[in-house]
Amino acid sequence: MKLTHFPERIIWFQSLFIYPIYLSGTLFLFNLLQVWILAGYAIFWQIKLSVGPEDQINSTDIRHWRSIPPLIWAWLISMVGMGVTILIGLYENDYNSNEFIRSTISWLGDWSLLGIYPILGYLLPIRPAIIYRSACVIAAQSLIAMPICYGAYLMKLPGLIYLSPLERIIQNGKSYYLINWYSREVDSDGIRFVLFTPWGPALGLIGCIFFFYALEEKKLGWKWLGILGSLAMLVTSVSRGAYLFLPATIAIVWAIRNLSFIQLQLSLGTSFFLGGLGSTLLLDRFQEASGGVKSARKSSSQLRAKLEQAAFDRWTDSPFYGHGKQIPGPDFLKNMPIGSHHTWIGLLFTQGMIGFCLFFIPLVWSLIDLSLKAKSSPIAHITLKALLLITFASFSDNIEKLSYLYWSVFLLIGVTYRQPLHVEEEFLLGK
């Protein structure tokens, strides 16, 4: 594939060498540098366009910042506001300057990416095909990595290879710097792969996203390697959530694309009516299914429930700006941080109602707008699927911690708005 612009070369380099970068313990740092290199490139061109001749704007593929749509601005403003909210929460809870520095560094590596990448996707000439092919390349490499990781398990090698010394320098959490062959399941003592991600559910989420990317690949060979690799990532992650997210996303987006607004209303109305008639039976079946899923990893489900309850109970101590950061839990929570394992309850605990709204508003706005565009835009269609997956995952994980892995989704949000799309009024009119 011909790489026509510098930003595409940066993305392609990361996909080609993701496993060497991971094994060196620098994947988080590399992805952090990637966004700031691209941001610097975008700023350079914005200055050049501002001081250069008027016709230069039309002679380059770089978009001018004045044309950035409101939704893209909303992501940036909200994520900057998130950083300010974190600092206010730390100040109100009397944390020292070291915590201010650590939290600022953490913000630069998680929440800030959700605000920067949509703008980069809009301003810079990055083709979606590069993102799709890159996902297929990573998935193909993962097909090679999995037998090696399983061989390490058969040879009874320890799951942990080493902890990168970068953790002592950046200090934003050990999980980003643990280099693993595999990880152990708590309940069954079985194994699950994490590959280049920090934990199993993260691999499951990335596998789901890459699956949708692979379906868009034009070259048949890369397409099938991407599909097989992404599904293998999903299966070997042993993530209960990911097993449900994929079919749910397919069903929801199919309904959005293929049913008119009136048809959706009729379908939902009929479903609710029939559901009401058989509500007792349906509730019993749902509870049985839910209990089966939770019992598959009972101790994990119980721990998550306790963490969520503890975070929700403590939220009222600082309802508006939160506690500023996650705090270590007591022994009965196995010292897991309060505010972890659930994005929304975690937001209430760490950033309060202000932080909750700062993420909720641009996310819901994006989902609605992409749903309207998905009928007429293939890029909006794939972006909607990927963003829905992240939304589902937010109810079982702190998804901001994984933004350095799924950054391509937010890049695609910006790419979607580069093109002159028109919302199909027929959808709203039911035609």
Regions found by a protein language model. Name each.
Residues 220-222, 247, 251-255, 351-391:
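Hydrophobic transmembrane alpha-helices and their immediate junctions
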Residues 4-25, 37-120, 387-394:
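N-terminal hydrophobic segments of proteins, predominantly signal-anchor/transmembrane helices
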Residues 34-46, 382-391, 399-431:
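Transmembrane alpha-helices of multi-pass inner-membrane enzymes
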Residues 2-8, 45-72, 214-227, 258-266, ...:
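Membrane-interface helix-loop-helix junctions at transmembrane boundaries of multi-pass membrane enzymes
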Residues 7-20, 369-397, 406-416:
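Loop-to-helix entry and N-terminal half of a specific, functionally important transmembrane alpha helix
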Residues 83, 87, 147-156, 254-295, ...:
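A membrane-periplasm/extracellular boundary helix in multi-pass inner-membrane enzymes
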Residues 282-351, 370-375:
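Long extracytoplasmic/lumenal interhelical loops at the membrane interface
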Residues 132-159, 171-237, 243-256:
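Alpha-helical transmembrane segments of multi-pass inner-membrane proteins
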